[in-house]
């Protein structure tokens, strides 16, 4: 029986294990695939759960078609404890699909496939918790307080991914969470309160080391389940923010956990090969514009582009130092907000130009980046965010229910389509006519 200890007592680095059907690696050089570089991401309002209702499955499929994107990051809630998610957990911790929600997700995927998407990245927006647990959302058991519940939590979520892989064979890339490193918002102990001040939430926030350990445990167990379904399935790191990780210490801590011979938790061995935890490096390289005052995003100075480029090169260097030079990277969120300046033509054009500059740099200096998922498809009308001027005004299209620009493409949408050779003026005109505000 596996011992519930963090430190494994057998250091399992045997090649015979690494090369089984459940694990890959063995030092072969990875061939980067850039066919799917242009990606998009947005949750669907058709799934419910507080997402803007104007962002429908049909609309997202039409957006994919008019843009010509081949990659899409799916946002799915796997926890049905509130009635709106993928799985139910029974008293024996067995899982069953919520058939109504499952049908909506199939429609989400099918509409995107209709729009030409071939490369999917699956993101779960919540975690599953054991039946008798009081946890919800992004709550994670504290392994130091309740190791049994922690291990059950890890295995339950891994099992869910295996069931999803069987249900959605067209999805080959699987993300294990979103921004767990962002101050507790994406991963925390039970008792964390969204919107509360830091003094109240401090006892419920994991340390960076603890977050890295949870990431490694989830990734290892999930990868094992996914590979058992299809060897082509790949696990990505959860979409790391890294926005405040200026010295890259958090990113490096993931490798430190793997190399410390303390992971995965609950096994009678340690596994020190990063390939057995994740196949894709995944983070959100938003540009740090905090130092610039309004008007935002005019023309970024050259030194800002240099700083941004060097940051990505430094992150890749850390991965290379730990044996992951040839591991692909996904930028699972990247984009610009107009902070509500919707009528500022210069601003909109400069945002469009900034996308092109970023893609030029990526193509020239970052061959390991396989997909950039532009965040997001549309501005928000019905879904309100706490920092609404910023969060609600990402999007390369105007929301179809925008009172002034309903259904129109922003300059960035057309510029990106032109850049990737998918622009069709007739398609854009037909799209805008279909969704214009009546």
Predicted regions located by residue number:
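Aromatic-rich peripheral "rim/lid" segments of glycoside hydrolase catalytic domains that contact
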Residues: 87-88, 96, 180, 185, ...
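Noncatalytic carbohydrate-binding groove/subsite architecture in carbohydrate-active enzymes
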Residues: 154, 205-348
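Boundary/entry segment of secreted carbohydrate-active catalytic domains
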Residues: 28-77
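Short, acidic/polar
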Residues: 48-64, 154-164, 249-270, 352-361
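Substrate-binding cleft and catalytic face of glycoside hydrolase catalytic domains
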Residues: 66-245, 288, 337, 384
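N-terminal secretory signal peptides that target proteins for export/translocation
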Residues: 1-5
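Sec-dependent N-terminal signal peptides of Gram-positive bacterial secreted proteins and lipoproteins
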Residues: 7-26
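Hydrophobic faces of well-ordered beta-strands that scaffold small-molecule active sites
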Residues: 38-42, 70-74, 119-123, 174-176, ...
């Amino acid at each position: 029986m596996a011992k519930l200890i963090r430190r494994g007592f057998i250091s399992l680095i045997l090649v015979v294990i690494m090369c089984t059907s459940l694990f890959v690696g063995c030092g072969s050089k990875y061939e980067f695939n850039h066919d799917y570089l242009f990606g998009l991401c947005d949750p669907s309002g058709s799934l419910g759960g507080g997402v803007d209702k104007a962002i429908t499955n049909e609309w997202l499929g039409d957006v994919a078609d008019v843009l010509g994107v081949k990659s899409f990051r799916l946002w799915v809630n796997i926890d049905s404890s509130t009635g709106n998610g993928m799985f139910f957990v029974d008293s024996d911790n067995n899982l069953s699909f919520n058939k109504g929600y499952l049908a909506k997700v199939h429609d989400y995927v099918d509409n995107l496939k209709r729009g030409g998407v071939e490369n999917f990245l699956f993101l779960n927006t919540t975690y599953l918790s054991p039946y008798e647990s009081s946890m919800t959302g992004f709550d994670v058991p504290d392994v130091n307080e309740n190791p049994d519940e922690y291990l059950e939590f890890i295995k339950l979520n891994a099992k869910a991914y295996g069931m999803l892989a069987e249900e959605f064979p067209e999805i080959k890339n699987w993300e294990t969470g979103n921004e767990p490193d962002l101050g507790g918002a994406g991963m925390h102990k039970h008792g964390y309160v969204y919107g509360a001040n830091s003094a109240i939430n401090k006892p419920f926030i994991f340390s960076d080391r603890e977050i890295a350990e949870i990431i490694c445990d989830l990734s290892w167990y999930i990868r094992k389940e996914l590979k058992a379904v299809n060897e082509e399935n790949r696990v990505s790191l959860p979409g790391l923010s890294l926005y405040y990780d200026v010295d890259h210490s958090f990113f490096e801590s993931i490798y430190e956990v793997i190399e410390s011979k303390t992971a995965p938790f609950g096994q009678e061995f340690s596994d020190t090969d990063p390939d057995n935890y994740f196949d894709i490096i995944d983070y959100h390289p938003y540009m740090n514009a905090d130092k610039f005052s309004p008007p935002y995003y005019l023309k970024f100075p050259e030194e800002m582009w240099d700083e941004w480029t060097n940051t990505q090169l430094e992150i890749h260097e850390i991965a290379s130092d730990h044996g992951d030079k040839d591991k692909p990277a996904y930028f699972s969120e990247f984009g610009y907000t107009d902070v509500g300046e919707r009528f500022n033509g210069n601003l909109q054009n400069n945002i469009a130009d900034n996308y092109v500059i970023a893609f030029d740099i990526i193509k020239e200096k970052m061959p390991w980046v396989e997909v950039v998922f532009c965040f997001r498809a549309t501005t928000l009308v019905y879904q309100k965010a706490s920092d609404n001027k910023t969060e609600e005004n990402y999007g390369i299209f105007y929301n179809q229910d925008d009172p002034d620009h309903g259904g129109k493409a922003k300059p960035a949408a057309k510029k990106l389509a032109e850049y990737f050779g998918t622009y069709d003026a007739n398609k854009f005109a037909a799209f805008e006519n279909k969704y214009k505000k009546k």
